[in-house]
A protein has these predicted regions:
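Metal-dependent nuclease catalytic cores that hydrolyze phosphodiester bonds in DNA/RNA
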Residues: 1-109
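Mg2+/Mn2+-dependent nuclease catalytic core
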Residues: 72, 76-188
Length: 213
């Protein structure tokens, strides 16, 4: 049996990046843990906040970037996909970049640096947030791994951008000054090792749940 035949015979699981990390980390929603639920109004406000922050970025920032990967793990073929809130590509030196017309076909050159931006609106005083929420960080790391793999990057950064949804009606200047950022840079090797552990854990748990039923 060749590799393609073996892959075809495996059970295909289609899963979003968000559902993947939530299945493994099993953390409650941050608003639920602080007495607020993800109501339709909150989801609508969260969508507004995403667009507002994204529009404040320059030409080096590309919003709502679809990413997907398919891989074999154990008895399964995982088809993992999601949408990065934003990808920002900056360049060393004075060279100006504008990817507005060719982002999807971009070749990332050696003097460019890529940052995956994950935007989260929460009902919480940002001063009380000392570190990014685990599932949010894991989402960004998944996107970073997929993008780095597909663009042959040695390193890539992730940024978690948090906004308190209670401040959404502030003026643009005050609003953009009321954001909190957490930023990390990873080597591709670090992300590859982490992502492998994530997918192995997922398939093991899925197999265990299947046997139970």
């Amino acid at each position: 049996m060749d590799a393609q035949q073996e892959k075809d015979e495996k059970k295909i699981i289609k899963i979003s990046v968000r559902n993947l990390v939530e299945f493994i980390l099993r953390e409650g929603d941050i608003d639920n843990r602080h007495g607020r639920t993800a109501s339709p109004e909150a989801m609508w406000e969260g969508s507004r906040i995403h667009k507002r922050i994204q529009k404040s970025k320059g030409a080096n920032y590309h919003a709502e970037v679809p990413l997907k990967i398919e891989l074999s793990e154990g008895d399964y073929t995982l088809a993992i996909e999601g949408r990065a809130d934003g990808i920002e590509i900056t360049c060393d030196g004075e060279r100006q970049l504008d990817f507005s017309n060719n982002f999807n076909h971009l070749t990332v050159e050696e003097d460019m640096h890529v940052t995956i931006d994950e935007i989260k609106g929460i009902y919480m005083n940002l001063d009380a947030l000392d570190e990014p929420v685990g599932v949010h960080r894991a989402q960004a790391m998944c996107y970073a791994y997929i993008y780095a793999l597909q663009h042959d990057l040695a390193e890539i950064s992730v940024q978690l951008t948090y906004c308190n949804l209670d401040t959404i009606e502030l003026t643009k200047t005050a609003f953009l000054g009321n954001l909190k950022y957490f930023r990390e840079t990873f080597s591709f090797a670090e992300l590859a090792e982490w992502f492998t552990r994530l997918t192995v854990s997922y398939t093991h748990l899925r197999a265990h749940e299947t046997r139970r039923h």
